[in-house]
Amino acid sequence: MSSNNPTPNLEQLMLEARQLMKDLGLPDKMQGDTPIFVLLVMLDMKPAKSWSEANNQKWGITPLMNKMRELGFKNLAPNTRENIRDDCVGQLVDAELATENPDKPRPKNSPKYCYQINQEVLYLVKKIGSADYPIALNNFLSNYQTIKHKYQAKRQSQRLNVKIAHNFSVSIAPGGQGVLIKSVLQDFCKYFNIDKVLYIDNTVDTARGYSPFIDENLINYLGIDIDKFKNSYDKPDIVLYKSDNKYLIIIEAVKTGGAINVERRDRLLSLFENVDVKLSFVNAFESFKELKRLTKEITRETHAWIMEFPDHMIHFNGDQYLFH
């Protein structure tokens, strides 16, 4: 790959970026126009800019899409956001060419969730079009497995591992609700003698991917409509089952908002229609300060649990107490 033009036009940039994708062994689907535009934006490249001027600033998906339009790629409807995230940026992360949230862990729904091209890739990119590129490419490919291991180890170290059954653990995604969810699974379950975990929203089961934990056998045993549950956008953060008195405990891990109000409670109830067990709704908070701030959102016939005081429960439904 070489170029005598230090300030390439857009067509030339795309051609050279596509060649980079090929050189790095990325699949054909990552060599189309959309992934190429994603890569150019993440490298802060545009016409009349030399590859040596590339950088690897952090990008959120929405700002990235806005920049793509500005660069000239107009065919981006708002509903393509997930495709950009999963099929383009996500593929770069899977290949260890980019990193999610390099500065600190964040929950998936954080508006500050971001991605960054890895430093080793940036070093290679800066050599595109120069006589040093073949050597830089060879060095990168020779060290690729070491590079992959480094970033995989970093992600693994950030995960929050918690045992939810005998000899069975799950990894909770770091950041945001992660610490609170881990505390619910460890402390709440301990103090209130909860013996089964039916569902956890924020778990990790691949090198990168976020995939909910779900006990399908328990769902079927309780008579929950599994297809309706899986396909619903209204699933809670955690669902527990207390088998000694047949209580299904639906928990929201509340950070900046999202406490169970009247509307939210009704939507959650619809997921468990015709289930022959008692239901209990719990808002989980990290601190009493957070509970106080959001108290007005919380509807009756729910409860509040605070991570700071794990053996206590606050009831928002008069004389009806949890699990009795």
From Swiss-Prot:
The keyword Lyase does not apply. Gene3D superfamilies: 3.40.1350.80, BsuBI/PstI restriction endonuclease-like. One of its GO terms (biological process) is DNA restriction-modification system. Activated by K(+) and Na(+) ions, whereas NH(4)(+) ions appear to inhibit endonuclease activity. Disulfide bonds: none annotated. It holds the Pfam family BsuBI_PstI_RE. Belongs to the BsuBI/PstI type II restriction endonuclease family. This is Type II restriction enzyme AplI. It catalyses: Endonucleolytic cleavage of DNA to give specific double-stranded fragments with terminal 5'-phosphates. Its EC number is 3.1.21.4. One of its GO terms (molecular function) is DNA binding. Keywords: DNA-binding, Endonuclease, Hydrolase, Magnesium, Nuclease, Restriction system. InterPro entries: BsuBI/PstI_C_sf (IPR041963), BsuBI/PstI_N (IPR041454), BsuBI/PstI_N_sf (IPR041962), Restrct_endonuc_II_BsuBI_C (IPR009528). Its cofactor is Mg(2+). Optimum pH is about 9.5.
